[in-house]
Structure formats: C-alpha cells, structure tokens
Design a protein with these regions (language model features):
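Intrinsically disordered, low-complexity regions enriched in Pro/Ser/Thr/Gly and acidic residues
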Residues: 16-170
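Membrane-proximal N-terminal amphipathic helix
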Residues: 1-15
Length: 170
C-alpha cells in the first residue's frame, strides 16, 4: 500500500469517498485540540470529545489510530481512517462507529468495528489472521482482557461467529 493522502487535493481519500457516498460531513483532518477532536471541513470545525471504551468497559485513552480522517454519513455513522505509514508498517485501518459517536455505548467490539486494508489491497476484518491486532489468545477481543485496545479485533468474530452478539455483556 502506498501512503494515502487524506487531504483536499484531487485523488485524496476524501475525494475517493465523496464520489461514492452521500455524506453530511467529509473531514479533511481529525486533530487533537485541547483534549477534544475536531473534524475540519474547509475553514469550519466541528468539535467533539469522543469517549470510547474497550470491550470490557474501560476508557480508551489513546485514539491515535483513529485520527487521520473521518466521514460522518447522513444517518450518523462515523467512519475513521488511520494511515499508519511509518509507525505500523504502512497499514491502513478503517474504524466504523455504526451508530455514531453521539449514540452510546461507543464500545470497541460492540458498536465500533475495525478493518485493515492489507498490502494486496484486501479489506480484512480486524482480528483475522494477517491483521495487526490478530492474536490467537484473543487479547484484543475478550470481555476479560485488559489490553488498551481490547475490542479492536472483534470485527472478525462478529462476522464469523453467529452467536457473537448474543454472548456480549451489556
């Protein structure tokens, strides 16, 4: 995967998605700003303080892998992008908060699911073999795990295990 441009020029990720989605907001950048995040659209900012928790309910204190861009769809779904060129080996992550950050529980593995685009351009559910957060012992998708990103690797289980949602604790 080559480094993706998340900015405003032609050919950027923003323009790629804008062609295919009717979106209410397309972010040029998501940036930390005094403890809040802002979706920047041209010269307008939408400020918010996203509070996400792990699968077991612990607060996620580091949202660095959610901060390279975002799209808010007309129905409120929030799609985050992470272009990890450099720090994680040119991996591209897509995180989807299916009901948006204004609706709870905002919990990894419950209403927030992550995907990775691999070196061959395949979209993989996080937790599948070959993804960055794959772990045979489920340390990134276990209601008992204390990992900082516990729940980030649950997309694979949610797709492949028909009882996944029945077994989730509220």
């Amino acid at each position: 995967i080559s480094t993706l441009n998340l900015g405003t020029q032609s050919g950027s990720l923003k323009h790629v998605f804008q062609k295919y989605l009717k979106t209410s907001l397309v972010a040029d950048k998501l940036a930390s700003f005094y403890g809040t995040h802002s979706i920047v659209i041209g010269n307008k900012y939408m400020f918010f303080t996203p509070e996400y928790t792990t699968l077991n309910g612990e607060k996620v204190t580091n949202l660095n892998s959610f901060d390279d861009g975002a799209i808010v769809t007309n129905d409120g779904m929030l799609i985050f992008f992470e272009n990890g060129a450099g720090w994680n080996g040119n991996r591209l992550y897509i995180h989807i908060d299916v009901n948006g950050f204004n609706k709870r529980p905002n919990r990894l593995g419950y209403d927030v699911f992550s995907f990775q685009i691999d070196q061959n351009g395949r979209l993989l559910p996080m937790g599948a073999k070959g993804t960055f957060y794959y772990d045979a012992n489920d340390k990134y998708c276990s209601q008992n795990s204390t990992e900082a990103y516990n729940g980030i690797a649950c997309a694979y289980k949610a797709i492949s295990d028909s009882s996944y949602f029945k077994n989730l604790k509220n």
